[in-house]
Amino acid sequence: MKKRIFIGSSSEQLTILNEIVDLLGDDVECIPWTDAFALNKSGLDSLIKQTRLADYSILIATKDDLTKQRGESLTKPRDNVVFEFGLFLGAAGPEKCYLIAEEDTDLPTDLDGITVAKFTRNSGQYNSLDKIVESIRTHLVKIAEMSQLGLLPSTALAIGYYNSFIKRVCEEIHGSECVELEGKKIKVKSFRVDVVIPETLDDNGVGNFTTLYNKRYGLSKATTCTNPALLGTRGFPFHFKVDPPDANQESPVDIHLLDIPSTLSTIVESLKLYLPSNQVGQDFDMDYLEMRELENFAKVLKYLIGRNAATKGYVNVLTNVKL
C-alpha cells in the first residue's frame, strides 16, 4: 500500500511543489494542497481531515513576503505554510512532518534550534532541491518499518494482543505440551500458530468473518491446559485442527492453531469516531485508513513475534485473507 504525503506551499510556488511530486515518484501517493480542499467545506476542516489521512507531510517555506520588523526588511514564508506545518506537526509528530525552507527565508523564532532542511534553487549544489527531497525519501524508507502510537489504535492493539494472547498461548503449550478439548487433554508433539488478518473489516468487525472461517476450515475450539493445583489459572481459548486430521489423538499429535484477533473489531469503531460520515456508500478515505491500520497491526505483530524465542518460528501472520 502506497503511503500518502500531503504537500503544502504558497500559491506562488506550485512549480516547486510539482517538482517535488515528480522527485518523489510513484512509490508514494502525493496529495498537493491544491487537491486537498473539498467543496462546501472550510479550508480548516479540509486541512484537519488531511492530517488524519496523510501518513507524512512536506511543507515548503519560500521567500514569498517582504516584511519590516524593527526597521529591518525580512523575507518570510506565507503565513498559511507556517500554520499548516504546525497543524501537521501536532497531529503526526516530528518524525512524519517535514519543513523545507528556501535559503535566507526568515522562519519563526519558535523553530530556532531545530534542524530545518534549507534548499537552493541552484542545481548542482549540496542542498539543491533534488538532494533535499532524496534525503527525505531515504528517511521515509527508514521509518516505514517502524510503528508509532497514533490517534488510531492498531499499534496498541497489536501489543496488547501479542502480550495477552499469542505469547501466553505459546508459553503454555511449550510448558505443558498439551491442549484441552472438551475436557480431554491431548498431548502435543509440535504446534504452529497462524494469525489470520482479514483483507477487510465489515460493520461487525471480524465477528462474522471468524464464524464463517472456522466453519469453512472445520476448526475445533480448545484451550491451553490448566493445572487444578494452581488457583486462578485459566485456559486460553483458540481454534485449531490436527495435522493430519485422522491422526490418533491417543498419541502426541501435531496441531495447527488459527486465530482471528477479535481485537481488530476495535478498529471499526475507532474509525467511525475518527472520520465520521453521514453518507451511505463507499468511502475511499475510510477504506484507506482501514487498510493502513490492518497493515500496521500485522507489522507490529510480526516484529514482536520475531523478538521472543517462545513465538519466533512458531507463529506466522497471514495478511489480506479472503473467505
Swiss-Prot record:
Q: Which CDD domains match?
A: STING_bact-like
An example Gene Ontology biological process: defense response to virus
Which consequence is recorded for altering E171R? 10-fold decrease of NAD(+) cleavage, binds c-di-GMP, does not form filaments
For this chain, the annotated S-S bridges are none
**Catalyzed reactions:** NAD(+) + H2O = ADP-D-ribose + nicotinamide + H(+)
Q: What is the effect of changing R307E?
A: No NAD(+) cleavage, binds c-di-GMP, does not form filaments
In UniProt terms, what function does this protein have?
A: Effector protein of a CBASS antiviral system with NAD(+) hydrolase activity. CBASS (cyclic oligonucleotide-based antiphage signaling system) provides immunity against bacteriophage. The CD-NTase protein synthesizes cyclic nucleotides in response to infection; these serve as specific second messenger signals. The signals activate a diverse range of effectors, leading to bacterial cell death and thus abortive phage infection. A type I-D(GG) CBASS system.
- What is the protein name for this chain? CD-NTase-associated protein 12
Provenance organism: Sphingobacterium faecium (strain DSM 11690 / JCM 21820 / NBRC 15299 / NCIMB 13408 / KS 0470)
